[in-house]
Design a protein with these regions (language model features):
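A beta-strand edge to alpha-helix "cap/lid" segment located at domain peripheries
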Residues: 2-32, 36-126
Length: 126
């Protein structure tokens, strides 16, 4: 696999992940989000969110009206991809407004030949 192809694949998958969240495409999210996935956002919760919690939010409470990756840098280290991005969204979780600009760090791993996201860290910029 070439480094350029891995970077392009990860950039495409990063955007697809949020598009599938917005569409509540749970079947595709099950494929993209790895077992053991963790989400950390100190501005929301003091402890990491589990995969199960993330998927439940995707299923019912987290509504993305619109989103944009304003900047994305993709690094690949063998079977690990690290994506640093500036991301904005108009969204809410149940009654909480989550519309803002964020700095995201996402970690993807090539597991059994396909990329899956294993971790996300989110910090509010706006």
């Amino acid at each position: 696999m070439s480094l350029a192809k891995d970077r392009a694949d990860l950039e495409r998958l990063e955007d697809e992940w949020m598009a599938r969240m917005q569409a509540r495409d749970m079947e595709r999210l099950e494929e993209l989000v790895a077992p053991g996935f963790r989400f950390m956002a100190i501005h929301l919760y003091p402890e990491p969110m589990t995969r199960e919690q993330w998927m439940e939010a995707a299923r019912s409470g987290y509504t993305i009206v619109s989103y944009a990756f304003e900047k994305m840098e993709v690094d690949v280290f063998g079977d690990t991809g690290v994506i640093h991005s500036r991301y904005s969204q108009v969204a809410n979780y149940e009654q909480t407004n989550l519309s803002n600009v964020f700095r995201l760090t996402d970690v993807w791993s090539r597991i059994d030949g396909r990329w899956q996201v294993v971790a996300r860290h989110s910090s509010v910029l706006g």
